[in-house]
């Protein structure tokens, strides 16, 4: 199985992340931020990537360090699990509807991190989570995992639906991208013979 495990300990956060790309969408998530937990659980369930995420962060300061560091560690764990990326689909895309909301996510596990995030929120918090941190979470995951990531809200008004639609779209796109394609015979999905750089 393709698995990754990252322990990241700083003066601001203590984090343990484990992922299994060949999982069933099982999760055990505790970040101290309820809405972030809910979104990571959605990611796991709809990508079928098993995720354990345990975070002890300095939430008495604010939510930035916990959000950023957990995303970095998740991206690193995904990168470790992907290894040399031999045989993967590499690309993934999904339209993700949720009631009045529709979002689109497209990504390339290219080894060249880049994020385009075209979505906004009309309220400052979802639960207790600062909505300004949502874009930063995706940027941090993409940077650490080496993913080119494009996220676009096509339309929608309910902030909860917008966020959940984006996370589910990301999950479904990742499921496509990490799945192994037997026709590739274990080859690296690039004419260069490697991904990144």
UniProtKB/Swiss-Prot annotation:
Main location as per UniProt: cytoplasm
Associated pathway: Amino-acid biosynthesis; L-histidine biosynthesis; L-histidine from 5-phospho-alpha-D-ribose 1-diphosphate: step 6/9
Gene Ontology terms: cellular component: cytoplasm
Cell compartments where the protein resides: Cytoplasm
A GO BP annotation: L-histidine biosynthetic process
Keywords attached to this entry: Amino-acid biosynthesis, Cytoplasm, Histidine biosynthesis, Lyase
Uppermost EC category: lyase
GO terms for MF: imidazoleglycerol-phosphate dehydratase activity
Transmembrane segments annotated in the record for this chain: none
SUPFAM superfamilies: Ribosomal protein S5 domain 2-like
Any Pfam family: IGPD
Catalytic activity: D-erythro-1-(imidazol-4-yl)glycerol 3-phosphate = 3-(imidazol-4-yl)-2-oxopropyl phosphate + H2O
Documented EC number(s): 4.2.1.19
The keyword Amino-acid biosynthesis appears for this protein: yes
Alphabetical list of InterPro entries matching this protein: IGPD_sf (IPR038494), ImidazoleglycerolP_deHydtase (IPR000807), ImidazoleglycerP_deHydtase_CS (IPR020565), Ribosomal_Su5_D2-typ_SF (IPR020568)
PANTHER family: IMIDAZOLEGLYCEROL-PHOSPHATE DEHYDRATASE, IMIDAZOLEGLYCEROL-PHOSPHATE DEHYDRATASE HIS7
NCBIfam families: PRK00951.1-5, PRK00951.2-1, PRK00951.2-4
Family from the record: Belongs to the imidazoleglycerol-phosphate dehydratase family.
Name used for this protein in its record: Imidazoleglycerol-phosphate dehydratase
Species per Swiss-Prot/TrEMBL record: Erythrobacter litoralis (strain HTCC2594)
Lineage of the species this protein comes from: Bacteria, Pseudomonadati, Pseudomonadota, Alphaproteobacteria, Sphingomonadales
